Amino acid sequence: MTRFQPILLGSDINVYGMARAFHEEYGLVSEAYAYFQLSPTKFSRIVNVHIVDDFNNFVTFRNFMLKLGKRMKAEDPERVLLLIPCGDVYANLLSQCGDDLREYFVYNTLDVNLSRRLAYKSTFYQICEQYNLPHPKTRTVTADEVKAGAYRDLPFSYPVAMKPANSVEWLNIDFEGRRKAYIFNDPAELETIIKRAYDAGYTSEMVIQDFIPGDDSRMRVLNAYVDQHHRVRMMFLGHPLLEDPSPVAAGNYAAILPDYNEGVFRRIKAFLEDIKYEGVANFDMKYDERDGEYKLFEINLRQGR
């Protein structure tokens, strides 16, 4: 077997999960690099976390990774350095690097333009329209439209769901009542939170959607791996049993039961291969009893948590 070293980007539960998988299968201790230490990996013996100042800045990230790769290759030229982004910020940074790091690392990434279109929720729904992928009815509003009160004119009734189109920018926004995503039962609730968000400095679009009825038992999560030739090699569907109840982690699952749906697999496989995807993809979806369809909420360009 080719000798390799996992290099993980981040310090969250995704990093711990990947490190645990590598340790259980190969007995390896992973090396992780992040701009902030999170609790899941803080005291772990199966992953060494290195904190790098300003590591979420592209120039800092690229320069550091080039130096790291050069040093590690010099130490052991025959060892493969397997680079895996485990968070949205790092997946975005790696896509911006393109092929710049391939002299030292082996990794999958997307063309930066495709990466941005998929990661940004409003453009992801446009892509869903092109590929006839079911998704909730959606109204996207800009900062200027929020000032003009456009969020009051929705093409669907309450309750509604709301989430930021730019999840990376949202990480740096703080205000009373901040959550990863919202469900509003009346217009007053929506107006209060959307105004607070933009007053706190959020600048990107906000996505407001028709709420799909039913509790979390209707949710499904799909993970797929697509190789460098844009062929789907693995797909796994899960039925979430327990969701993280904390406001900033809504949508993160603590327990998932394996599931199977051939129709969902066929549709997602055709989509990923047609857009020439590469790497790991994670989809959140919910079953809509009104039309019998699984509606896509988003794609994450990384493993699911």
PLM features: what roles do these ranges have?
Residues 1-110, 147-148:
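ATP-binding N-terminal substructure of ATP-dependent carboxylate-amine bond-forming enzymes
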